[in-house]
Design a protein with these regions (language model features):
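HotDog/MaoC-like acyl-thioester-processing domains
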Residues: 55-56, 67-134
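Generic secondary-structure boundary/loop-capping signal
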Residues: 4, 10, 45-47, 105
Length: 134
C-alpha cells in the first residue's frame, strides 16, 4: 500500500521508491531462478517508465519475469500493477550478474530461457536483448 512517506511533492508515488521496490522484486525473482541469493550482484536498471501515477492508499504489486540470460547475467522484466484496477502503472528491466559469493568473481549460471509463444514475453525478450546490442 502506498503510504504518505512514499509520495513525492505531487502526492504520487516517488519514482525513487518505485525503482527501489522494482529492484527488490526483480532480485527475488533472480534469486529464485539461480537458487543463490548470495551470488547475485545488481548491474543495471533499464528503461524504467511510469505510465500512470500511483496514488496514496493504492495497493500495488510487482510481477517479475526472467527475459534474458547471458553467460553470467540475467535480466528480469518487472511490471508495477494496481491491485485495484489491474492496470500496469510502470514497467522496467533489471540486470544482475551471478558471482561466487565470497570472492565476487563472475560465475556462469547455466540458466536457459524456456520456450514461449507468448507475444508479450517475446517482445520483452527482444527489448532486453537490445540493451546488450543484440
Amino acid at each position: 500500500m502506498i503510504k504518505m512517506d512514499d509520495l513525492n511533492h505531487h502526492k504520487n508515488l516517488y519514482a525513487g521508491r518505485g525503482i527501489e521496490w522494482m529492484v527488490e522484486a526483480s532480485f527475488i525473482a533472480a534469486a529464485a531462478e539461480t537458487g543463490d541469493r548470495h551470488g547475485l550482484l545488481f548491474k543495471n536498471c533499464h528503461k524504467f517508465e511510469f505510465n500512470k501515477s500511483v496514488e496514496p492508499g493504492e495497493i500495488i504489486s510487482y510481477c517479475s519475469t526472467l527475459v534474458r540470460c547471458g553467460r553470467t547475467s540475467i535480466t528480469i522484466h518487472v511490471d508495477l500493477i494496481s491491485e485495484e484496477t489491474g492496470e500496469i502503472k510502470a514497467t522496467g528491466y533489471t540486470t544482475f550478474v551471478t558471482v561466487v559469493a565470497n570472492t565476487h568473481d563472475k560465475r556462469v549460471h547455466g540458466i536457459v530461457l524456456d520456450e514461449t509463444d507468448n507475444r508479450e514475453e517475446l517482445e520483452w525478450r527482444a527489448e532486453a536483448d537490445s540493451f546488450f546490442g543484440r
